[in-house]
Amino acid sequence: MRTRAVELVLAGVLLFGLTVAGSALVAPDRSTAAVDDGSERATLVGSQGGGPGWHEHGSAYLLNGTDIEWREDSADSYFDVQRLSDGRVLAGFMDGGYEECGPYESPCAHTGIRLIDPDADGGAAVVEEYSFPVRSQSNSEIHDAEPLPGGGFAMTDMDHERIMIVEDGEVTWTWNASQLYDEPEDPTRTDWLHINDIDRVGEDRFLVSVRNANQLVIVERTDDGGSEVVEIINEDTEGSPDDSCTGNGQLRDTDGDE
């Protein structure tokens, strides 16, 4: 009986694990945030969309139960969304059809951040935008952005694999992942590190997701305007094999060890 009980427990644990894994595999590509304006709770959603490459018919919208209170769908894709203290919504986005393309052929895609006013005349509308051209819509987006106490926004950039601070439409600080990881010849041509999340965890300190390295890093903006990695979570130890991470081709070993 004892053996049978152990078998049942193990089977239950296995079933739970498979259920969680299955849920992760089929989860829709949406970012959600709870909104509480003092009267009732609602859910703010950023939808990347569908179609080839998951960059068609994206939108940002507010759900109250099953009712959509407002929707802004002028971009091919929206990503992380959050409501700001003034009621506007900060959203990472990507959209095609831009004429200002820098080194790339026109028309091209842009990625960046938008500020959406849900209460604009005529319905929710984009009232501010910061964006720049990217080579393609594949793994090149501003996936996450955070407002800063003194103004400006910190954000991730998957195209150049960096984090940066933008103030008044200008990049005022940057940390490039190539300062820590071995860079390919052209990061804009491959899904190298897939840096897709940033959180402010202290004054001038940011927690950054480096998905393809299976690591988190804490980056500090130094007083001289530079940057320093102060902690690596899940850091490789010297001499540790990377076979378990790279065997299925899902993660990359880019830390320069053997």
Residue spans for each PLM region:
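Hydrophobic alpha-helical segments
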Residues: 1-258
